[in-house]
Amino acid sequence: MDLITVREVRTPSTRAELRFAPGELPLGGGTWLFSEPQPGLTGLVDLTTLGWRPLEVGDDVVTVAATCTIAELTRLPARDDWAAHPLVAQCANSLLASFKVWNVATVGGNVATSLPAGALTSLLAGLDATAVVWTPDGGERREPVARLVTGVRTNTLTTGEVLRSFEVPTASLRSRAGFRRVALSPLGRSGALVTSRLSPDGEFVVTITAGTTRPEQLRFDEVPGAAALAGAVARVGTWYDDPHGAPDWRRHVSALFAEELRTEALLPQQPPPAAPFVHRPGPLGSATADAAARTAVPAPVAPGPGAAAAPPAPAPAPAPAPDPEGGAA
């Protein structure tokens, strides 16, 4: 959508240039900003020109820049001990966006928009990520993502503050994780998204999103009993009501998912299955690349020494001779 009131787009290259005049907003990927009218918006400040590295992997934290795109996030390399790594693809695919959106939409934008179905909020809250916020006075503050989002399109960011990055503890990535999601239609907006995390020290955390107006975290020192978990879910009072799901339905499926994840955490740990992941081609890739990859026939493999060769394919049957009357013989 054209934002006809915008008069200027500024492209800062340093933090000193990152200032907001009245009527200006920060611009990341713009996938939400350009999706509807923005009354009173007179200028944009493009954060992507600041040159922040999308991903930085350290010993204790993985730093995700606010301008990191969804596509870049899904390319975060897994490590052998990162049992929770499949959550990245699972949550990213919950957005059900086209590859065009994946290549421009940013992690910071998804969190700052603060919609209940913001799947990257689900991911970061579930992994106990901390948001690093730049303040107008040149300082910064930190706040857990689970507390940054306070409601439907509301958060703790104040005028002039900018999301700089998210710090994901590698300890969370080493935790055993679970994931459940439901929508009213196969390709619908998330009605409820529940993740679990069992830390090496035994702490069990259930994070409920999409079905609630803000992330709801249920923490236990160890995997709780069924009644304790059900009681904790019942005490949640922020169930969301919109055309994508009624509050009582969201409460019911979230409780069901939480119990499934609790039971799953008590089972012996298995190697994590490959995360359901839909490859998103780059900006210049073909929109049909996914379909082509799924339907491609693998090349035949030559038999090894001593192996019996596969029998040749039968020759095609000869075409029927034409019938003089115009039919087939």
Where are these regions (language model features)?
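C-terminal structural segment of proteins
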Residues: 1-306, 314-329
